[in-house]
Regions:
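Alpha-helical tetratricopeptide repeat
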Residues: 18-19, 26
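TPR repeat positional signature
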Residues: 18, 59-62, 66, 111-114, ...
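Terminal, low-structured helical/coil segments at or just beyond the last alpha-helical repeat
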Residues: 112-145
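Amphipathic alpha-helical segments of tetratricopeptide repeats
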Residues: 35, 39-50, 88-98
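Acidic, Ser/Thr-rich low-complexity linear motifs
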Residues: 2-9, 47-60, 95-112, 126, ...
Length: 145
């Protein structure tokens, strides 16, 4: 009897590759694939524990993964899911900022990440408010007819 062993090597992509694939899927409106790739990117980045290891580049990659998922869900009008991916990093960053002394060199990276997150949330809220306003205007115009 002959036994043949087949060795399969599974190539794990890094978070940058997942984001690149996610972006490609997003631009082609392949929402399910984009969500999967962005989710895998987020999972890969979270393994690096950006807040614990105080790595600014990984911290911003982590934040970008959340924002990509938020943008993906917002483009599909899944606003509560989008909001989740905007709120979650802000909550973690806020807690971490509260536990980090201002003279810690990583404090500035945390603060910048928090500001970036707040800006994204403000843009989301502005878009939601303009959507609500335009919907209300359309309904009012329909009622007037």
């Amino acid at each position: 009897m002959i036994i043949i062993t087949i060795r399969i090597t599974v190539m794990r992509m890094d978070w940058k590759t997942y984001v690149t694939h996610g972006n490609r899927c997003f631009h082609n409106k392949h929402w399910v694939d984009a969500e999967r790739h962005y989710g895998l990117a987020l999972h890969a980045v979270e393994k690096e524990e950006p807040v614990i290891h105080q790595n600014g580049d990984i911290l911003f990659a982590w934040l970008a993964c959340h924002h990509n998922l938020a943008t993906l869900f917002q483009s599909q009008s899944k606003h509560s899911e989008a909001r989740f991916y905007l709120d979650t990093p802000l909550e973690i960053l806020e807690k971490t900022l509260g536990n980090t002394p201002p003279d810690d060199p990583f404090f500035i990276s945390l603060l910048r990440a928090y500001q970036t997150g707040l800006n994204a949330l403000c843009l989301f809220e502005k878009a939601m408010n303009s959507t609500v306003a335009s919907t209300a205007t359309s309904q009012t115009q329909e009622n007037v007819k």
